[in-house]
Amino acid sequence: RPYQNPAVMATRNKTSKYSLRDNPTGIYAKADETLAVFVGDIYEGGKVSMLIQDLNGGYNNSKTYELSEGYNEITVEVGGLIYILNHVNDDIPLRLEDADNDQKRNIEAKTVKVHFANGKVNGYFDIQKNKESDWAQIRDNAKYQEIDVLGEYSHLTWRISDFKKYNTEITKTIENLDRL
């Protein structure tokens, strides 16, 4: 689905923009791997891209690839977690339930379907879809070193080994982060 570009609110609030990684896929790739990515209809004027983030080299160690409708074959230069970027300058709230009918129609019109024919499944936790009882299975099945955890307002990417070591209560953790 589309998300409002963080630069819009950053300009309005006179702050810096933060993460553009609003659409985690739960997929990861290794460097030099070739991915087959199918993309549905892209709305007029839309730009959809795939970002691969390797936190081993720091937050700025990422590579973005523009996607086009149909079949995309991409040999990735950087391995890591994969995100789909679909940013708009429209007035779209972060939470779908906060959208009015016009905003919901706009979100629906600018949602682009993306399918990975290959790639490795890592999974992610989304507090709006998952429960605490799902967490152990999601965490234990993750194959990459980090995993994405989505709250209602927050997005955390952290090392799986730390979540396991400290037996993290994930819903409590992300709810606390949402309240910040």
Model-based region annotation:
Residues 1-123:
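Beta-strand-enriched, solvent-exposed domains that form extended recognition/catalytic surfaces
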Residues 104-106, 115-154:
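Compositionally biased low-complexity segments at domain edges in trafficked proteins
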Residues 135-180:
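Catalytic cores of extracellular degradative/oxidative enzymes
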